[in-house]
Amino acid sequence: MNIYFDESRNTGEIGINGDKLNYFGQRYFVLVGYIEDKSITQSYMSFKDKWNKFVNNGAEMDEIKGTDLLTRKNNSALEEFISTFIKGNNIYVTIYDKKFFLVSQFLNWFFMGLGDYDFNMYHKFLLFLMKVDDYFLTRYINLTKNNSMENVREFVSYIKLHKFAECVTSPFEAVIAVEISQLVEGLEKRGEFTEYLYDTISENVRIKKSDRNNIVNLTALGETILMMKHNIKDLSNNEIVVFHDEIEVVQDYIKHYWKNTMIDFVKSKRTLEVQLADNIASIYGNLISKVLPLNTENDLPKLLSDDYSWIRKTIQKVFNYIDNNNIKLVISMREAALVKAYISKKDFKSLHEFNYDVLKRLESRFQTELSNHLSIDETKKLFDR
């Protein structure tokens, strides 16, 4: 089985730019895998022949870019693309919030694999900590880049003193802040806490004369392949051949961890299948960035406005035309509930009705996540199959 991958939204390493995280307005990384189907690839070639010059303003280009399909002028081409290619069971989509990536990584590291031994507490803390500011996360990233016992001790002290004021907007959240502080104190009393953190922090990989880590591409690729293996029973690694668009540094990072995996990095200009994956990734990335992030309830009204009617209709199509088991949302449960409500066919008559639907979905989302949760050992077993 050949599967072709490409991505969208500012790929690469999550790092620091000044006093901010470097993803700016491209927080949601999208990876798309296309399982090769000769007839679909042939259809895409015909689509390119038909629309290439029109989309590219009269020029014959090597590729049609997904971002160009989203312009008003190219709406007819976009409609044909969605109805022809974003459907069926051979497309896999992973949407990964880069902030979620950092917060969940921090949470599992600092609280010693919390997601495996207390799923309820893990998601309560995760939803709470998604509100932390960039300064908190830059402190964490700096530690991953400069790991030492002294720096770990300083970071633990910082966590103990941190009041998480930016996360507290209700009495319930004030209690969570206290619970985090108490848990840190309890872990310290068990002994060797600092040593554990020093030994288990995210490692750096030396690539092109720089230390690299926190590259979301690798994790998203692994999540997507796990999703595919979960859906296609008995699919083994020996049956999968991965083709991925060439990306400097990222491909070296992936190769470092996947030494024995069949993965070939190819030029998109020469590979129709990668171009198809690129177009789909660009469409998802552009649309999801219009809907998320959900920072406060004040972000909801715009989603129901007339200005967003085209966005809602289009995002409903791209999410509902393919098998939902082939789409993985690695975002907060709150935002996942919002997306599920937004792509539904419900005609919300008021903001209250929309918000109520989001809250109902949030309540059920926890049970969904719990039923889908795999421990580290279970994940490794599936990945190695």
What name fits each language-model region?
Residues 1-94:
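An N-terminal structural lobe/cap that precedes and organizes the functional/catalytic core
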